[in-house]
Amino acid sequence: MKNWRIWLILSLTVIAGTIGYFSSALSKNTQPYEGTELTGTAPDFRLIDQNGSDVSLSDFQGKVIVFTFMDSKCKDTCPLTAAHLREAYRQLDQIEAKQVVFLGINVNVRGNAVADVLETTHAWHLDEIPGWHFLTGSRGNLEPVWKDYGISAMPNPDGNSIMHTPGVFLVDPSRQKRWYISTPFSVEGGAEVTLPLSELLVKHIREILRDH
């Protein structure tokens, strides 16, 4: 019971903070949220994808890299994020799509087998994105990656799924961090409208491609 109460307090704190942030931003009639601009070289890592292949971030130097942290056992937010990744890919033209790679990084060490991320890839239709990689590994391999990108993860009371930091990172072809997007899938406030995640991703992908 004690662990449940701790989890509930933490969950309510995170939710309240998120609501407070967006309410404050909208009440001040700020510009639509576009994400947080980042700088610096994206930390490299090597993990295993849903096909059992070793994959590192540096393998994709020369391409725009779009990656997010996902719970392989998630039933709510992560499948929605997956849908927006698929939609973002569909909105790219043929030339653009060849210059972009989409990755997911597992945050669930209780569902970290290759079979887990393969099953989730199929369930969320992420195999519709050519070159998609859902990366996983041991706790010892995953936790340093979470730390490098400021991702926190803790088990939900159901014992299977994980409450974790949401968001999508964009890295340019020189492996420089460009954007972190942590946003509701659509927010309206007065005259300002935050773009859906898929459209925001496409917007930033095209900006990065123009720069290179």
What do these predicted ranges mean?
Residues 40-42, 60-64, 97-102, 129, ...:
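Extracytoplasmic
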Residues 55-85, 102-103:
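Short active-site neighborhood of thiol/selenol oxidoreductases, capturing the structured segment around
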Residues 82-145:
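Structural microenvironment flanking redox-active thiols in thiol-disulfide oxidoreductases
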Residues 131-132, 143, 147-155, 163-169:
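Structural micro-motif
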Residues 156-212:
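Thiol-/selenol-based redox modules, centered on thioredoxin-like
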